[in-house]
């Protein structure tokens, strides 16, 4: 009888834990995805802060030339970064216990792998947690779908691209200048500016900013005034009120006359779907573009594509970009390569005699 009572108490304790994890009454929803999200993001954040402040230089290229990235080793907020794991490690899983010592682990850039892998797990679980909370509240699942765009972008630069290039040393450094360096080198090696998927991403980000500004300014300009002239119009809104807070007909009429009638939405639901879908689809395409360029399916190459009747090349902007790419590539990892990859890949002329 005592055993049965203990089992019931144990089940009751587990049941209470499950109810607490999945309760929507908590100030912050945890959820089953949160059980994994919280420790992974805490780990990634803690190691990032410590490494950004105090990590020793990392031999990123695997040629015994360490690169400093932390504040205590001479960097500032702009130049500092978590240096990617060494090319000597490649794609190997490199936890602390795989190194002979902590000093070796730090020298080979172990913190980068630790941060990136925990971060990707954490943001994926955050996306799952968004879906989980929506499900519990009876909401539609599109918040998690929208968040999948930045998750896909992060996975592309931190995981897919290193896999395609064969080393975590090719991943994006975790810092401001390191991000810019990654962008410049990516352009030099893959001509991303001439890739249609990147163009769609630019349209998505800048278009999304434009549409967001247009929508916000239109709504703010067509608020239904509930206050006197001496009070802020914002004070006329009560959280949870049933009445519309702005006049969509007035906004529709204004914008329809500013451009033309059918350029303006007359359905609030389709308008907000468009505002969400435009940047999300654009960022999806950019992440897909990064993931294909990871395996060297690069941007368009229109170099020397225009010639005159004598066969002489007439330079276009494509040739100017190509010249810039070669310049950036020859300066990249200058001690690791004697020539840019494009030049080194040219077949050597045959020698007779």
Curated annotation (Swiss-Prot):
It holds the Pfam family Photo_RC. InterPro entries: D1/D2, Photo_II_D1/D2_sf, Photo_RC_L/M, Photo_RC_L/M_CS, PSII_D1. The keyword Transferase does not apply. The chain crosses the membrane at residues 29-46, 118-133, 142-156, 197-218, 274-288. GO terms for cellular component: chloroplast thylakoid membrane; photosystem II. The record marks 344-345 as: Cleavage. Pheophytin a binds at residue 126. Chlorophyll a ChlzD1 binds at residue 118. Keywords: Acetylation, Calcium, Chlorophyll, Chloroplast, Chromophore, Electron transport, Herbicide resistance, Iron, Magnesium, Manganese, Membrane, Metal-binding, Oxidoreductase, Phosphoprotein, Photosynthesis, Photosystem II, Plastid, Thylakoid, Transmembrane, Transmembrane helix, Transport. It catalyses: 2 a plastoquinone + 4 hnu + 2 H2O = 2 a plastoquinol + O2. Its EC number is 1.10.3.9. Its main location: plastid. [CaMn4O5] cluster binds at residues 170, 189, 332-333, 342, 344. Residues 345-353 form a propeptide. Belongs to the reaction center PufL/M/PsbA/D family. 2 of the reaction center chlorophylls (ChlD1 and ChlD2) are entirely coordinated by water. PSII is composed of 1 copy each of membrane proteins PsbA, PsbB, PsbC, PsbD, PsbE, PsbF, PsbH, PsbI, PsbJ, PsbK, PsbL, PsbM, PsbT, PsbX, PsbY, PsbZ, Psb30/Ycf12, at least 3 peripheral proteins of the oxygen-evolving complex and a large number of cofactors. It forms dimeric complexes. NCBIfam families: psbA. This is Photosystem II protein D1. It comes from Vitis vinifera (Grape).
């Amino acid at each position: 009888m005592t055993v049965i009572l203990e089992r019931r108490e144990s089940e009751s304790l587990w049941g209470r834990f499950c109810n607490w994890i999945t309760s929507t009454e908590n100030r912050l929803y945890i959820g089953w995805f949160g059980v994994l999200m919280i420790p992974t993001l805490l780990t990634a954040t803690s190691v990032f802060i410590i490494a950004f402040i105090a990590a020793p230089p990392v031999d990123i290229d695997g040629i015994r030339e360490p690169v400093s990235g932390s504040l205590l080793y001479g960097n500032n907020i702009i130049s500092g970064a978590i240096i990617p794991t060494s090319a000597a490690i490649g794609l190997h899983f490199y936890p602390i216990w795989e190194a002979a010592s902590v000093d070796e682990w730090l020298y080979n850039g172990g913190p980068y792998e630790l941060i990136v892998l925990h971060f990707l797990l954490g943001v994926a679980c955050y996306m799952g947690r968004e879906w989980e909370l929506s499900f519990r509240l009876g909401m539609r699942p599109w918040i998690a779908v929208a968040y999948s765009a930045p998750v896909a972008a992060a996975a592309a630069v931190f995981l897919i691209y290193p896999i395609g290039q064969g080393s975590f040393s090719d991943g994006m450094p975790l810092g401001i200048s390191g991000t810019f360096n990654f962008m410049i080198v990516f352009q030099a090696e893959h001509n991303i500016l001439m890739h249609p998927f990147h163009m769609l991403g630019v349209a998505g980000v800048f278009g999304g900013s434009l549409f967001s500004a247009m929508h916000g300014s239109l709504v703010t300009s067509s608020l239904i005034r509930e206050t006197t002239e001496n009070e802020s119009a914002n004070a006329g809104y009560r959280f949870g009120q049933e009445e519309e807070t702005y006049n969509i007909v007035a906004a529709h009429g204004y914008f329809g006359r500013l451009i033309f009638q059918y350029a303006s939405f007359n359905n609030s639901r389709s308008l907000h779907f468009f505002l969400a879908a435009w940047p999300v689809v654009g960022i999806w395409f950019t992440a897909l573009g990064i993931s294909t360029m990871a395996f060297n399916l690069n941007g368009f190459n229109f170099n020397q594509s225009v010639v005159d009747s004598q066969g002489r090349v007439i330079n276009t902007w494509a040739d100017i970009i190509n010249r810039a790419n070669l310049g950036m590539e020859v300066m990249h990892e200058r001690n690791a390569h004697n020539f840019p990859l494009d030049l080194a890949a040219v077949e050597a002329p045959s020698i007779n005699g």
